[in-house]
Amino acid sequence: MPKFFNEVWLRDMSPKTMQGVVDFLGNLRNGVRPHNLPGDLKLLAGPWLSNEEAKVYFVFEIDDPTETFEAFAERVADGLFLKRRLTLIQDWDGARSFSKYLSGRQLKAA
């Protein structure tokens, strides 16, 4: 299943925002998800809070990340999140496989 590194910018680090974020991500960490997150979403690592800015990070796997839109947009509407960046990531076996592929291919003339 595809894995994603998720960076989420928080509205701020006020007590109300932080409590909402801690509750939401704490529940997700314990396997409790809101009704509008798909059942195949699995938190793999994190969450972590940035020391430099109002941001949290976590890694999850999901078959179709577009299915997280409603749950994320709801947190934006509730004033917890500002924006996010989802980065599709590859495990190290995948990186080795890609390196082997690059090393073995023939350069074609343009």
What is the role of each PLM region?
Residues M1-K55, D63-E70, Q90-A110:
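Short S/T/G/P-rich N-terminal loop/turn motif that feeds into the first structured element of a domain
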Residues A71-R75:
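Short, aromatic/basic amphipathic alpha-helical patches
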Residues D78-D93:
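Conserved short beta-strand edge segments in small beta-sheet-based binding/regulatory domains
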